[in-house]
Amino acid sequence: MCGRCCRDLRVPLGLSEALDWLRDGGEVQLLCEAIPWLVEPAADDLAAAYKFRRSFAALSGTLPLRVVVTVVAAFEGPCPHLQPDLACGIYERRPRVCRIYPAEINPFIELRPAGKACPPDAWSDRHPVLEASNRYMEPSLVAGIDAFRDADVGDVGAKLVLCAVLGVSSTALANEGFVAVLVEREAMMRAIGTAIDRAEAIEGNACAESWTVVSNRRRSREALASVDARAVAPEALPAQQKYLGFHASSDD
């Protein structure tokens, strides 16, 4: 047993997995990031197509965005399901991301052992080959990754509804950070259930309006304002929302 990768995490979940996590007493957060989407990318731009499929359209002022909402199980210290013997207490129904670790969900992120919490022995030659020529070798692993990606895309409409139900309309810029949405457990459970129920009524080209982009960098806010987007500093976020920045605050 190891358990090194089961601590201090935000684990991406599908919406159905999030409901299970909440029913078990865990905490679920939303992480919101946005990509300015001024023009449609070329048909052969596979990275852009991947971002498009897992996001919904929105406007900040007159600036078109694609908003990516990641639903995560959040915990500090050991996972609430990590047992004293380091076994998983929900092993048979653990989230998909736990099942595929240390593989990457994003097809455009390279697997780097140095960036994983696995002990060095996990990468030794005595274990089956995990990856070769940028392809994962184990069929069940590939199936798990595909299942997560399918759920991620399938949940997009419900995530748009979920943000509306929770009154969420703030997002960070992609590559700058996230706006984390921190809602009490029962309220989050009700909101996700409502979002799933209403998702079928959402049209594929639905656009969420009046979003605000949050940045802790003045230059980013000024650049956004110059293209008629609504941009604010993290201090303007409402209660139950928190800015998680990748960079130090900057006023220059």
Protein language model features and the residues they cover:
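Short loop/turn segments that flank or connect secondary-structure elements
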Residues: 1-252
